[in-house]
Amino acid sequence: VCKKTDQVEHMVDNFAYLINKLGFIPNGNRTYYLGRSQPPFFALMVNLLSEEKRVAILLKYKAALEKEYHFWMYGTEELNYRKPAIDRVVRLADNIVMNRYWDAKADPRPEAYAEDKHIAAASANAPEIVYRHIRAAAESGWDFSSRWFKDGKEMASIQTTDLIPVDLNCLLLY
C-alpha cells in the first residue's frame, strides 16, 4: 500500500459509502452515470488494505462487499431458458451463471451524445441496442477497445452486452 494506508482507507471509505447508498460504485459522480458501474475492483481494494489493517478491515467493509456483489448478481433467480439474460447476469446452456457489462439505459451517453448518435447511424443494429453496447463498454473501463467490436475495427460493430468477459468474471470470483 506504499505507506499511504490512511489515504487508501479513505478512498475505500468513499467507495463503500457509494455502494451503501446506491448499491454500486457509479462510473462517475454525476447523475447520468447512475446506469453504469465501475468494474468490480472493490474487493481487491479491500483485500489490499487488509494486508496492513488485517481482518478487522474485512469486517468493516463486509456489508459493502456483499451489496456490490448482489448488484452484479441481480436477476440470477429469475433466469431461465426463456429469459437467459437479465441485466448483468447470463445463464449459459449448462446452467452456469456468468456476468457481462450492462447499462440500464439505452440512449446516447450525455457525455458523448453526438458521437454516440453518429456511431448508431453507421451501425446495422437498432440505435437503442448500439447505445446500450456503448454504455456497457464504458462500464467495463475498456472504452473503446476493439475487444468489443464484432469486426475488430469499427465501433459501429460494437457488441459489448453480447460478450461474457473473462476478466469481469474473475473479478467477481475474487
Show the residue positions of the predicted features.
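Acidic, mature catalytic/reactive cores of soluble proteins
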Residues: 1-174
